[in-house]
């Protein structure tokens, strides 16, 4: 275990690191974050003893590092420095072998089996055996970086201090290196402190993070306690947005540009929709921020093409994703820029309406096939046939994440109310239907103009969505019923 208490130090009269305290238990990895010049490397130098501290303590398992001899300390602690000016005249194997120096004794050091095994293991872990006899200066920056990490690993110390270990590495080698280091920490009970410039990598791999600001600890804790928008923005002086990692409970940030997106003169208009026998199509000049439960590109994203495609009643293709992607490509659209839904009802039965407001307008488009309507409170009791109400809400305005979700809720409530009003029943239970079995909803916004933080019924936007979806759904049901009667 490594314990740092009130560590203070710097260069000459210049105090860089000011009263830093923390502990890292065995088997854990602490990531150091902070902007350029905040004192990260200086702190590492103080911890490793390369730079004497002005005050404070660094203890390894309860013993101050000042009590260790140089070789004894090197057996406990391996350091990957930020710059590797040394050793460029050596081969890869020779460079990695230098990591074994604390384990050599006497003037005529004897190279043991243990030394050989440690070097071989380090070469293997960093996947650099193939360069074993290559002079280091003939390797790429990323390959060299792996050699220096191998040198630190060959030292077989229980504490690893790494200054930007992923420097120069491509994304796969970043992952491989950090996976290896993390695995080593767990399997060999290593204590690891590592400096990171990449906040997202640090969040993904570290158990604890320390955010350094002008030599002070601004925040320390688990990644979710440290990777917070306001703190990161203040310390790094950059606009960021925080979002969840898709697979791990580790927050990630996205850098936001200082330069604004050029404003588009065009807005979403109902008359710009086109309706053919194949599809209802809306093509936007600018990408719209979209949240949907579509077939293609469901979830959140930015898209310019919106398709509600007509398919036969008996459309039943196992891989509808591939089939729909092909359909989009064959029509000259880009699947990466398109949200696509399907409906069995005729596209001419779509209802598209524009609702003006004080902030801009909302365009709503609904197709409603209610032959297989469902009372959702009884859905679990029996199998369901396919049926679809597709609801699109396109907003000329800038929605918050909250507003996107509220818009979905408001739209769903309005749809259900319309079914109730029209007396649409679940054919299997005879009770009032709440929707159909495969309804889709889409909310998209220009993200320009008025900022719309909410979209519940209490807001103007929510009110428009509520009455708009209600009206459109009622009219769409009427068209559907009329067509069925004929
Ligand atoms: N050898 C030195 N002598 C005098 N001042 C130094 C020395 N090394 C670093 N400094 C100063 O100490 C401050 C902190 O530097 P340090 O290298 O610790 O920052 P850092 O957080 O690691 O930055 P970076 O992200 O750029 O690597 C800087 O203002 C730097 O100019």
Q: Can you annotate each of these PLM segments?
A:
Residues 56-64, 73:
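Conserved ABC transporter NBD signature motif
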């Amino acid at each position: 275990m490594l314990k740092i208490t009130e560590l203070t130090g710097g260069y000459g009269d210049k105090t860089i690191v000011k009263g830093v305290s923390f502990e890292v238990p065995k088997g854990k990895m602490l990531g150091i974050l902070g902007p350029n010049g905040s004192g990260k490397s200086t702190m590492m130098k103080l911890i490793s003893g390369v730079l004497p501290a002005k005050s404070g303590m660094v203890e390894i398992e309860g013993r101050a590092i000042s009590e260790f001899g140089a070789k004894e300390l090197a057996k406990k602690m391996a350091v990957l420095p930020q710059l590797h000016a040394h050793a460029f005249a050596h081969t890869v194997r020779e460079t990695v072998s230098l990591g074994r120096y604390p384990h050599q004794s006497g003037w005529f050091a004897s190279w043991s089996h243990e030394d050989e095994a440690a070097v071989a293991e380090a070469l293997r872990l960093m996947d650099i055996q193939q360069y074993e006899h290559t002079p280091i200066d003939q390797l790429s920056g990323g390959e060299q970086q792996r050699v220096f990490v191998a040198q630190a690993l060959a030292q077989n110390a229980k504490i690893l201090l790494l200054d930007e270990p992923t420097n120069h590495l491509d994304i796969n080698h970043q992952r491989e290196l950090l996976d290896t280091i993390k695995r080593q920490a767990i399997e060999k009970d290593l204590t690891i402190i590592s400096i990171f410039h990449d906040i997202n990598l640090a969040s993904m791999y570290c158990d604890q993070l320390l955010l350094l600001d002008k030599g002070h600890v601004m925040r320390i804790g688990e990644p979710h306690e440290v990777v917070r928008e306001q703190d990161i923005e203040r310390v790094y002086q950059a606009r960021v947005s925080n979002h969840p990692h898709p697979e791990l409970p580790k927050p990630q940030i996205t850098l936001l540009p200082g330069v604004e997106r050029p404003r588009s003169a065009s807005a979403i208009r109902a008359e710009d929709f086109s309706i053919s026998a194949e599809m209802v199509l809306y093509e936007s000049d600018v990408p719209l921020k979209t949240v949907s439960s579509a077939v293609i590109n469901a979830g959140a994203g930015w898209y310019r093409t919106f398709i509600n495609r007509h398919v036969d009643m008996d459309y039943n293709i196992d891989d509808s994703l591939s089939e729909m992607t092909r359909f989009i490509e064959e029509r000259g659209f880009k699947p990466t820029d398109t949200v696509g839904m399907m409906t069995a009802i005729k596209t001419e039965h779509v209802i598209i309406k524009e609702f003006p407001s004080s902030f801009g307008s909302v365009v709503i488009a609904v197709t409603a096939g209610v032959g297989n309507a469902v009372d959702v409170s009884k859905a679990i009791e029996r199998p369901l046939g396919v049926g679809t109400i597709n609801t699109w809400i396109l907003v000329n305005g800038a929605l918050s994440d909250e507003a996107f979700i509220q818009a979905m809720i408001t739209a769903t409530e309005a749809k259900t109310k319309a079914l109730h009003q029209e007396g649409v029943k679940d054919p299997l239970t005879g009770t009032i239907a709440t929707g159909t079995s495969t309804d889709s909803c889409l909310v998209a916004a220009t993200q320009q103009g008025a900022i719309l933080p909410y979209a519940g019924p209490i807001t103007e936007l929510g009110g428009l969505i509520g009455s708009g979806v209600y009206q459109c759904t009622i009219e769409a049901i009427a068209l559907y019923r009329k067509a069925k009667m004929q």
